[in-house]
From Swiss-Prot:
Its membrane topology: Multi-pass membrane protein
Notes on activation and inhibition: Na(+) is not transported, but it plays an essential structural role and its presence is essential for fluoride channel function.
Protein name per the record: Fluoride-specific ion channel FluC
Swiss-Prot/TrEMBL keywords: Cell inner membrane, Cell membrane, Ion channel, Ion transport, Membrane, Metal-binding, Sodium, Transmembrane, Transmembrane helix, Transport
HAMAP family documented for this protein: FluC
Superkingdom of this protein's organism: Bacteria
One annotated GO molecular function: metal ion binding
Protein task: Fluoride-specific ion channel. Important for reducing fluoride concentration in the cell, thus reducing its toxicity.
Keyword Ion transport among UniProt keywords: yes
Binding sites annotated in the UniProt record for Na(+): G75, T78
Residue ranges the record marks as coiled coil: none
A Pfam family recorded for this sequence: CRCB
């Protein structure tokens, strides 16, 4: 139960921070391009790289700290960071084909799922 609470707590903080970054980007850059989403995804990817190296590899941090910061905080801030870490991990293990398939499938199927979701809801409207 404590693990779920840690994920929820980290996720709440990450989600609120994502909201503020999005609002900041909207005020700074305007709404013609999704600058907020781009910023969160890039920053989240950098931070998950830092966390993965420091927490998981250098300091052998507890499962609870990993759940709080990586699954919770970064999961709430951006799930794109988890996708990116998974892809890089495949390449680092020498599984380039699997990494390429994972990237193509993740992007392609995710875009297709959004299109399908939009189509279903538009058909029901």
């Amino acid at each position: 139960m404590i693990q779920a609470i840690l994920v929820a707590f980290g996720g709440a903080i990450g989600s609120v921070l994502r909201y503020y970054v999005g609002q900041w980007a909207l005020r700074l850059m305007g709404s013609a391009f999704p600058w907020g989403t781009l910023a969160v995804n890039v920053v989240g990817c950098f931070v998950i790289g830092v966390f993965a190296e420091l927490i998981a590899r250098k300091f052998d941090a507890s499962v609870e700290l990993r759940l709080l910061l990586i699954t919770g905080f970064l999961g709430g801030f951006t799930t794109f960071s988890a996708f990116s870490l998974d892809a890089i991990s495949l390449f680092e293990r020498g599984e380039a084909v699997a990494g390429g398939i994972y990237i193509a499938a993740s992007v392609g199927l995710s875009m297709a799922a959004v299109i399908a979701g939009l189509a279903v809801m538009r058909a029901l409207a």
